[in-house]
A protein has these predicted regions:
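N-terminal pro-sequences and low-complexity stem/linker regions of secreted or lumenal proteins
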Residues: 22-468
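C-terminal motif of bacterial Sec signal peptides marking the signal peptidase cleavage site
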Residues: 16-19
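Bacterial N-terminal signal peptides that target proteins for export
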Residues: 1-9
Length: 468
């Protein structure tokens, strides 16, 4: 593995200064990989919590938190939703690849996004300059340079104002959705860098989303690299040279047995469920055969069961909650207002439950969606970080009205779960991740529930896609 290197907030990173000539297109045809899947990346530190975590704080967390809910929406950056938030590291204008300064235009409730693939993330970041979001597919008309005002997303802002808003929380990978959703359960993607799809040599026809159930499905992946080859990919990401990076990719069947956090929960006898919608890009757990074809599959449930379970007093100790596409906040599948209302319904159920007093929710968005953000992500390894996304820590014990500015990513939520429930790490990423515990004050007067009203959504003429 590469040594861990990070860009420090507000600092400068030395990068190769090149003209921004990167473009995003279809990957060149790579070799077909027929070997087995990658071994589990070694954890640099097995015991959790790590030595940097105050043990008294850990003890309080284990006493106060009995339930953790990882609520994952889609495709928004921090600057898109919270760039105007007082006290947070946000901006109201951005830079394009030619150096122009452009205001972040007031977004519409149904504004489209731009490309947000793995290579799109590399292009947009542009070696840390954060100025080539206009070079993405569908981004040349500055579609990604938009921003919501507080009156447009009042309930998301209410959660941020009442609880703890994280302004240095990054996507674990450059993108896209399916890849990020591996990270939220495994703290790795087993080298995958793209959404799965029908086999292109068969004409690209067929149904997506069957993963292990369809041996003809494929997804783009990095091959096994030597350390030297991995260092070269890291260098190419700094340039960036996406054409050279894509040329290394191979096709693999997205059916691969890696250990995921639910395995650790099962072994420890800790209850869990993974609530999700039908979108294939949000159900990557189907690609883990020991889950798909074993007894753990019974704990992969429809999102529609979440609120009834909470109301019945059956909230698991650990929950992944992933919405259906039309209320996921993904541009093109539904209006943001509808997605916000869905989130309110889920959180109201938790806050009206007796278990609220023992619960921590981390609400976040899975990738950047092609939208502008100005903060350079740490370049930890060849997978990311990707661009910054919002995260809100919602709990009776999260610091009220606070800005959490420590560097974190999706692996941090896994680390929080591992710390609270005394579990080992899965990979180097979560072993070294921030565990978010300093976003909490377990000796404060508990935050009361914030039960919000759903709002009437503005009319729209947009024609949305059916959820995949």
């Amino acid at each position: 593995m590469l040594s861990w290197r990070a860009r420090i907030a507000g600092g400068l990173i030395a990068v190769l200064v090149v003209a921004c000539q990167a473009t995003v297109g279809a990957p060149t045809q790579g070799a077909r990989e027929t070997e087995g899947t990658a071994p589990l990346p070694p954890a640099a530190v097995i015991p959790t919590p790590d030595a940097q975590t105050d043990q008294a704080l850990v003890a309080l967390a284990r006493k106060k938190i009995r339930h953790i809910v990882f609520l994952v929406k889609e495709n928004r950056t921090f600057d898109t939703l919270f760039g105007r938030f007082p006290g947070a590291d946000g901006v109201t204008e951005g830079f394009t690849c030619d150096g122009a300064v452009v205001p972040l235009a007031r977004a519409e409730d149904d504004s489209p996004g731009a490309a947000h693939s793995f290579q799109s993330g590399i292009v947009a970041i542009n070696g840390g300059r954060m100025n080539c979001f206009d070079q993405l597919d569908s981004g040349h008309n500055l579609e990604g340079y938009i921003q919501y005002h507080p009156d447009q997303i009042p309930n998301y802002w209410a959660y941020a104002q009442t609880f703890t808003l994280a302004d240095r929380f990054f996507s674990s990978s450059y993108g896209p959705t399916a890849v990020e959703h591996y990270w939220i359960i495994a703290s790795q993607s087993d080298r995958f860098v793209d959404n799965e799809r029908p086999l292109e040599s068969q004409g690209g026809e067929g149904k997506i989303g069957d993963y292990c159930d369809d041996p003809l499905e494929r997804a783009w992946s990095f091959p096994h690299f030597t350390d030297e080859e991995e260092r070269e990919i890291y260098r190419l990401e700094e340039v960036p040279d996406v054409k050279a990076i894509r040329a290394t990719w191979v096709e693999r069947w997205p059916c691969h047995d890696i250990r995921i956090l639910p395995d650790l929960l099962e072994e420890a006898g800790i209850s869990w469920k993974y609530y999700t919608g039908p979108s294939p890009y949000l159900t990557v757990i189907r690609g883990i055969p020991h889950v798909r074809y074993g007894p753990m599959w019974d704990k992969v449930r429809s999102w529609e069961e979440f609120v009834p379970d909470v109301e019945a007093g059956a909230l698991p100790s650990v929950t992944w909650l992933v919405p259906p596409a039309e209320v996921s906040d993904h541009p093109g599948y539904g209006a943001l207002c509808d997605g916000e209302n869905w989130t309110v319904r889920q959180l109201n159920a938790i806050m009206q439950s007796p278990e609220w007093k023992h619960t921590a929710v981390v609400l976040t968005w899975d990738d950047f969606g092609g939208f502008y953000d100005h903060v350079p992500p740490p370049h930890l390894d060849i997978y990311g970080y990707g661009p910054r996304v919002p995260a809100i820590v919602i709990s009776p014990w999260s610091k009220p009205g606070a800005i959490f500015s420590e560097t974190a990513d999706f692996s941090s939520v896994l680390k929080l779960i591992e710390t609270v429930f005394d579990l080992p790490a899965l990979t180097e990423r979560d072993a070294n991740a921030n565990d978010l515990l300093t976003a909490f004050d377990f000796e404060q007067q508990p935050n009361p529930p914030l039960v919000l009203e759903e709002r009437e959504c503005p009319p729209t003429d947009a024609v949305f896609q059916a959820g995949p």
